[in-house]
Amino acid sequence: MLIKTVFAGFGGQGVLSMGLNLAQAAMIEGKHVTFMPSYGVEVRGGTANCTVAISTEDIASPVASSPEFLVVMSQPSLARFQNQVESGGVLFYNSSLVTADIPRGDIELLAVPATRMAEEMDSPRSANMVMLGAFIKKTNLVSMDTIFETLKETFKTKTKLIAVNKKALMAGYDLALPKRQGDASVRTSSG
């Protein structure tokens, strides 16, 4: 099994944090992992993306020309990466900020109102964790318990942020629970 995921958005949206937390969780679970970040000219407000490859075997190349999963937090990121998603793959998008009008009928779209949900929790900077929670539920690449372990390490000097981010992760995870066709949060690109 080799699964590649691209996370993309503006600098400051926590895109690299999503990828790094996923990569760390996969390593804790004993999987082979590569994490390849890419920054724009300016960090906050510029573009940022990263590729995470997870496998049960050695990984020959971290480059993901056709990732199975794409997670986008901004409209420019959707425009840049949408055509790279492998046929049969899943495109997760922050429907609070992104309009996904994609003519492809060969991928599944998962709309996650991450920014709106984070704002409703009075934690607008945790939109990335809302998205990561939905991603983990849908893909089952790592367990939520392992992601919670990575949060403890990530925020060991800012312990009050652990509970905030855990709440955001669970909100995204719970949003993605129903996977029926026609559900408000899940649809295919052909429907």
Regions found by a protein language model. Name each.
Residues 1-191:
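Active-site cofactor/cluster-binding pocket
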